[in-house]
Amino acid sequence: MNDLKKSPLLILDFGSQYTQLIARRVREMGVYCEIYPYNINHEQFKKLNPCGVILSGGPSTVTHDANPRAPQWLFESDLPLLGICYGMQTMAVQLGGQVHSSTLREFGYAELRLHGHSQLLSNIEDRTAMDGSALLDVWMSHGDKVTELPPGFKVICETRNAPIAGMADESRQMYGLQFHPEVTHTLQGLRILQRFVVDICKASTDWTPEHIIDEAINKIREQVGTEKVLLGLSGGVDSSVVAALLHRAIGEQLVCVFVDTGLLRLNEAEQVLSMFGRHMGIRIIAVNAEDKFLTALKGVTCPEEKRKIIGRTFIEVFDEEAQKLTDIKWLAQGTIYPDVIESAATSTNDAAVVIKSHHNVGGLPDTLNLKLLEPIRELFKDEVRHVGLELGLPHDMVYRHPFPGPGLGVRILAEVKKEYADILRKADAIFIEELHNAQLYHKISQAFAVFLPVKSVGVMGDGRRYDYVICLRAVETVDFMTAHWSQLPWDFLGKVSNRIINEVEGVSRVTYDISGKPPATIEWE
């Protein structure tokens, strides 16, 4: 992807929860961007040859000298700069302005009034005030505020509690915004970012699925040559897109290993083998390891221990199959850009203990002695989906709800047994089927069933019975960091409950989880 990455837009991260959202908004414009720590090395910066820089927000306060600052050389680089929230405040302080903590903090919506003309905000408005001023509805999240402009800057917008809500030095193409244009609550936020990125930075807009695929194929062929590549295919979005991309790039040089853990969704193994094996012609080695996984999980109830056992057992099975293939030189993984960002951020943080391992193939042993191939490591999840569609993968596969790496193992709140997995598989399939039938599936972010290890009395015909409880979970979220429980219609839930109790032997009661995140997590374990 070298040509598409020429002169990218850089985002320097000061720790904001919205940093990745900024990058996703920039990518939506067809512009390639990368996220780097705020203290990026000058030599590395020069090699990247960026077209412009965005300074993100962050949780710190610039009123403390020890807190993060942008490299001072950045302000002498002659590149367009945009500081957002904390990014604006550190820009102001480092260029000679003043920032103070405010007693009138702003969190949430605010009405922004534009001042005169600025290249960044001109002709962008939600409505007009009585005096003719342009007004914008924006999203604020700050306690500090700029109280004195740096030399050369002018005020470009204000709110009731922040007289300097935006500033600009047009001659040096430096801009600061106290609000967050990257969040959807700022209605014109994408237009504002586009004004900076495309109009001011003159960024190239060639970052499209077609171009991404073309560049990726060229890079794969250049790296791999005539050597063979091994991929652990799970049926999830990331590994599916990698499989389709590699198959298009190198054809029969790709070998996939699919491990049936016994903890997959109903008919999932058959669907994966049919789609990639029979229809696409990819060579797949299918391994039924259900007994091995269930034996390893016998007697284990601790969620974290279950995860470790499932991960360790997968590695053993995968390694065993890989050792049989003596002509493999490469191991492909479905690493995506958020994984890369997380790993980079954690590696520079002494307090960080655990990096989330990549589903299924994360932590494969060094004894494989294979070279690593990560063809989608520069893509966000939504970009992976767009590439998948462009490669011809079915919409329902590409937009399937997330499924945890340990599978049903962490949706059975007890020791994992085949009986429990079979009950849960059937109940979950009914829930998902009815969501599709009611055209609700793609309106929610994630839905699944959970097996509860308690028995509840029920009545079937003239008899009483004690059977298990199934809990249904459905959430709506943008980033999976926070989530609302989905307010599905009661008659719909009643229909699903009735079907599960009548069609799944061993279930006497169905409940619905109405917990948000926080305080709950999306998964139960």
UniProtKB/Swiss-Prot annotation:
Gene3D superfamilies: 3.30.300.10, 3.40.50.880, HUPs. Pathway: Purine metabolism; GMP biosynthesis; GMP from XMP (L-Gln route): step 1/1. It is an enzyme of class 6 (ligase). Residues 207-400 form the GMPS ATP-PPase domain. One of its GO terms (cellular component) is cytosol. It comes from the Bacteria. Keywords: ATP-binding, Glutamine amidotransferase, GMP biosynthesis, Ligase, Nucleotide-binding, Purine biosynthesis. Its EC number is 6.3.5.2. GO terms for molecular function: ATP binding; GMP synthase activity. ATP binds at residues 234-240. Residues 8-206 form the Glutamine amidotransferase type-1 domain. Pfam families: GATase, GMP_synt_C, NAD_synthase. The active site is at residues 85, 180, 182. It catalyses: XMP + L-glutamine + ATP + H2O = GMP + L-glutamate + AMP + diphosphate + 2 H(+). Homodimer. Catalyzes the synthesis of GMP from XMP. This is GMP synthase [glutamine-hydrolyzing]. The lineage of its organism: Bacteria, Pseudomonadati, Pseudomonadota, Gammaproteobacteria, Legionellales. The gene is guaA.
